[in-house]
Amino acid sequence: MGTRSRRPQLLWLLLLCGTCARVCGCNETRMLERLPRCGKTFAERMREVAVWKWCDLSQFIVFYESFTNCTEEETVVVGCYWPNPLAQGFITGVHRQFFSNCTVDRTHWEDPPDEVLIPLIAVPILLTVAMTGLVVWRSKRTDQLP
């Protein structure tokens, strides 16, 4: 009988706690205090991976997923939405710390030399003009036949 009388109280407590974050707003100070925990855990896990493998996502994807989930949970716990500019700045800092040397060398594309480029442009244009002329000439010729 005592537990039945507590159920409405528990329900009200859950409803109040669920809306507290929305009513109280985002506590950015607490968020910035809590996010480094995620970064510390991620850094400890990244020590298990050889530095030269830090650019190979398959080597640390599980750690990175945990890091992302941790930042999301810590942000939501203090009543903030995720992602937000402060959390994003923190995540960017972690990226700079671990992945700043992971730039991808992109192939620099250059135009071919003029000796190759001019025929590649001119031949289709001349073929188009020649075929159009041929079609016009043939259509005029059929009109003249009895």
Swiss-Prot record:
Gene3D superfamilies: Receptor activity modifying family. Plays a role in cardioprotection by reducing cardiac hypertrophy and perivascular fibrosis in a GPER1-dependent manner. Transports the calcitonin gene-related peptide type 1 receptor (CALCRL) and GPER1 to the plasma membrane. Acts as a receptor for adrenomedullin (AM) together with CALCRL. It comes from Cavia porcellus (Guinea pig). Its main location: membrane. Keywords: Cell membrane, Disulfide bond, Glycoprotein, Membrane, Receptor, Signal, Transmembrane, Transmembrane helix, Transport. Belongs to the RAMP family. The keyword DNA damage does not apply. Disulfide bonds join C38-C70, C55-C102. Residues 1-21 form the signal peptide. Pfam families: RAMP. Residues 22-116 are extracellular. GO terms for cellular component: cell surface; plasma membrane; receptor complex. This is Receptor activity-modifying protein 3.
